[in-house]
């Protein structure tokens, strides 16, 4: 692919990510994506085969960030509880830098488009399984309380992250947080929970 072609495809992806995140699949048209990207609408079909394929590619790109993070955390020679702390710190950073990720992925669960639900669920399952495995490992290591249920811990961590980003503006106003302090707030919330299950 030439530099020009790559640039056009990237512009389409960037525009589509922004529009799908701020609106949704049905409310976003090829014309909207073409206008925002500055790329001829015919090229959207050329590169991605239409709006549905483009939507799935956008979702895939967003989920890859989290799957790559899981791989990197798993490579670290740390205790399970420290891996959980590292994961929550890094995922908070990713989502503060790229807040559209949460809106895209979780909107598909809340208001399914009908053709990507299984795709998104499979990615979320991998994240859940990763957290479940770490908690189970932590119990075996003796660094996490044996009384906790791994799947409940995984759901709680996921819920803290998702709730914060889906209600971000309300939380910011209620807690009088500035944008600069939001990442610190989320890290502290997650760390407080992890501290409560650690031995």
Q: Which positions does each model-derived feature cover?
A:
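N-terminal intrinsically disordered/low-complexity leader segments
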Residues: 1-7
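Amphipathic alpha-helical linker/stalk segments
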Residues: 3, 58-86
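Generic hydrophobic, amphipathic alpha-helix propensity
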Residues: 8-17, 33, 58-66, 131
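Helix-turn-helix
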Residues: 11, 19-53, 57
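Amphipathic, non-transmembrane alpha-helical scaffold segments
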Residues: 55, 59, 63, 117-128, ...
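All-alpha amphipathic helical-bundle segments outside canonical DNA-binding/catalytic cores
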Residues: 82, 118-123, 140-156
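C-terminal peripheral helix-coil segments that are non-catalytic and often amphipathic
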Residues: 86, 90-93, 97, 125-141, ...
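Amphipathic alpha-helical segments used for helix-helix packing
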Residues: 96-118, 167-173
């Amino acid at each position: 692919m030439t530099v020009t072609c790559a640039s056009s495809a990237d512009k389409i992806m960037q525009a589509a990510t922004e529009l799908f995140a701020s609106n949704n699949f049905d409310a976003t048209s090829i014309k909207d994506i073409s206008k925002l990207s500055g790329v001829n609408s015919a090229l959207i079909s050329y590169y991605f085969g239409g709006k549905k394929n483009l939507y799935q590619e956008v979702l895939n790109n967003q989920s890859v960030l989290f799957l790559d993070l899981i791989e990197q955390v798993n490579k670290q020679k740390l205790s399970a509880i420290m891996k959980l702390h590292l994961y929550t710190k890094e995922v908070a950073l990713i989502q503060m830098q790229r807040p559209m990720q949460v809106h895209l992925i979780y909107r598909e669960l809340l208001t399914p488009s009908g053709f990507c639900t299984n795709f998104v669920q499979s990615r979320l399952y991998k994240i859940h399984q990763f957290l479940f495995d770490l908690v189970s490992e932590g119990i075996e290591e003796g660094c996490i309380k044996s009384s906790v249920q791994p799947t409940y811990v995984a759901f709680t961590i996921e819920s803290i992250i998702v709730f914060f980003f889906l209600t971000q503006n309300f939380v910011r106003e209620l807690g009088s947080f500035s944008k600069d302090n939001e990442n610190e707030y989320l890290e502290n919330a997650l760390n407080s929970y992890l501290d409560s299950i650690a031995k």
